[in-house]
Amino acid sequence: MEDRNKISLRSGRRKKRPTISAPRQISGPIAQDDSNRPPLPGADPSQASAQPRPRPPPMAGGKTSDLVKRRYSTRFNQPSSISNGGAPPMPQMPSLANYEPRETVAAARKPPSRSGPGVAPVIDIKGLRDPKLKPDRYVQAALSDATEDQIREFEESLRQVKTRVGTDLQQSVMQNRTQFIKISKEAEKLKSEMRNLKNFMSELKVNTTAMRAAAAKSDEPMPSDLGVAPGISSRRDRRTSIADRSAMWNSQMQALYKGVEGSQKFLPNAVGRHVVQDAGPWIELDNATYKSRRAMQIFLLNDHLLIASRKKRKADAPGADARGPMMKLVADRCWPLLDVEVVDMSSTGESSNSGRNKLADAIMVRGVGQESFIYRTEKPQDPEKKQLLLNVRKAIEQLRKGLRSEMEANNKARETINYFASRDPGLLQKTELLATLSDIKDMLIEVDGKQQNLRWVESEMDDLDIDVAMQRFEDAVVRVEKLKAIARGLKNHAIAQDFINFKVNERCVRLANMIGRELEMTHDNNTKTRRNVSWLTRLGFEDSARESYLAARSGTIHKRTRQCIFQGDLHLYIWELSFVYFMVIHNTVQCFQSCFPPPMMSVCVKWAKEEVDAFNIILARQLSSTELRGQVWTQCMERAKEHSKLLSEVGLDFENLVGKNLMIYEPIDQGPSVGLGLS
């Protein structure tokens, strides 16, 4: 064991352990330099020991310092060009301006902080607008540490925010309504302009087609005159003036009736009906074999196509004119132009030359029920065929144009009726006025020197409705007076006058009802009462204003007397009743004199007398249990008459009416008690 204790893994000799001295008290900083230097003579030893000792410089040399110097002194050559090696370019980073940081969102959703222990929580408007807001959690987080006063302040702030939001919503609704009305007017105006543009484009297309056809056919001969009917007008007759056009058309139809037997049965006389072309002689062909069947003659009218057969006149017939022509025309078929289709048969291919030659100058008339007839000109390559086809197309186009115009006029009239009726359902009850709306849709009225149509009246009605809805009564009354003045000035336009009066009167009733309700609520304020009565008088509802005001004052008397409670002192109770009655009557008469015209004062006096009579009934009922002309009875009567003297200040003397016929009042005497079957 002793040998093992002598064995050690450390190499070399063991050094002697350092000796640690006991701690010493340091009275000053340790000197960094010259610590063993003795103090100067005459110097304070404490100052000498307080001087700092400089730190010795680091030792130079060493392996580590050489490596560090060599590392920092190494140079690296910069490459001339750095290649990306074909890597794609760096994608563009998205902008973070559109994204809100999480801290901001969290802070926005947190309940509002409180500035102090005595201040109510501030309402976070942005947090309230959050669609995912949960009210229970929001209130719990905001008012978790709030006091009763802070909760009340927070509730009042919420009410203010609610009121402000309601006001903003109402203003937004009215602004949207105004913009909607304005946009509707612009859309209606644009619709009318587009309709006019469509009509102009249609007319331009028709005129352009006619000009091209006329230019293409200018070198062809014009259609011949009616050979058999000499009265039918020729091309020279068509050059007559427009004033004689109706007479010319009438003479054409008379000549047609005379020249074509039975034509009046198919073509009765109508306004504007005239002959467009006498196409001359034609031959009717068989539909299957294309063989000739009989001789025909075609007449084209502006709205019909007449086919007449040519027959020989019998010379030995009774009443026959020997000097007349040998051939006569008999009406065979007649179709409206819009019900038939005229097809050129020259475009149909035929195998045989004879068939092709026959159909080269033929047309097919396809009528109602797919019934078709083929007609060929007598003369080969007769220009009447091309002219007939051209005139048929032009006549059909004119008819369709007329139908479109008529349909658009009817639609416009129907739109006008629907427009006015939809805006005012009460107009449907005015059948006479509703039937004339299509006639007055384009009527112009003079307003302040300018011509306006009835749509302007509708715009004024819209503004009036807005004023009534917003309770701008002064503006509404002024607008009503303006419209009534315009209606009175339309002496030559009875229909427009009735229309405006109907619209204005309907709004007047609604406006008067609203002002009447306000009058009943504010009858105790003389200024507001005078203003409301003035509005109703200007609207022509002074009777309604008078009745509403007096009814409201009667209700006030009834309510005030119900507040008087009898507590055993009859004299005090009669004093309160008489004071309420005569003071309210005094104030009512005084306000009535300042608000209503003098001719209506009789109604107010009658109302005051009725109220005094009602007071006498109550007085007689209360004094019926007292001794007649006793002390209590006398005191109550004197007090009532003293209060009745208030009416003398407004020009009424009802003192003699107080207690009148009081002794006539007899209370109902109750009989003796009646038992069960015993009297």
Swiss-Prot record:
One of its GO terms (cellular component) is exocyst. SUPFAM superfamilies: Cullin repeat-like. Residues 74-84 have a biased composition (Polar residues). GO terms for biological process: exocytosis; Golgi to plasma membrane transport; protein transport. The keyword Manganese does not apply. Residues 1-123, 214-237 are annotated as: Disordered. Residues 142-208 form a coiled coil. It is found in: Cytoplasmic vesicle, Secretory vesicle. Keywords: Coiled coil, Cytoplasmic vesicle, Exocytosis, Protein transport, Transport. The keyword Transport applies. InterPro entries: Cullin_repeat-like_dom_sf, Exo84, Exo84_C, Exo84_C_1, Exo84_C_2, PH-like_dom_sf. Belongs to the EXO84 family. Component of the exocyst complex. PANTHER family: EXOCYST COMPLEX COMPONENT 8. Involved in the secretory pathway as part of the exocyst complex which tethers secretory vesicles to the sites of exocytosis. Plays a role in both the assembly of the exocyst and the polarization of this complex to specific sites of the plasma membrane for exocytosis. Also involved in assembly of the spliceosome. This is Exocyst complex component EXO84. It comes from Gibberella zeae (strain ATCC MYA-4620 / CBS 123657 / FGSC 9075 / NRRL 31084 / PH-1) (Wheat head blight fungus). The gene is EXO84.
